[in-house]
Amino acid sequence: MATKKSGGSSGNGRDSRGRRLGVKKFGSEKVIPGNIIIRQRGTKYHPGKNVGMGKDHTIFSKISGFVHFRKGVFNKTFVDVLEISSVS
């Protein structure tokens, strides 16, 4: 008979996978309608011209063009998509 009780398995050793958040299309990259530009929690980046925001704060393109980041009032960062014809 064993004189020492068997050790139980550890209760730790699990972790959830990352949420794959962040910038997916960077400044001056070409996008088409529906392309995801940024996945985020909350509004670190705000939607600007020609972009939309999903209910999970994902920013996506509404038109074909190029991604542009700019600072607005109160140092907020806005994401725009500039039309191909307006970029020279």
UniProtKB/Swiss-Prot annotation:
GO biological process: translation
GO annotation, cellular component aspect: ribonucleoprotein complex; ribosome
Keywords on record: Ribonucleoprotein, Ribosomal protein
Region (Disordered): 1-24
InterPro entries listed in its UniProt record: Ribosomal_bL27, Ribosomal_bL27_CS
Classification via Pfam families: Ribosomal_L27 (PF01016)
The organism's place on the tree of life at top rank: Bacteria
Molecular function terms, GO-annotated: structural constituent of ribosome
Family: Belongs to the bacterial ribosomal protein bL27 family.
PANTHER family recorded: LARGE RIBOSOMAL SUBUNIT PROTEIN BL27M, RIBOSOMAL PROTEIN L27
Protein name: Large ribosomal subunit protein bL27
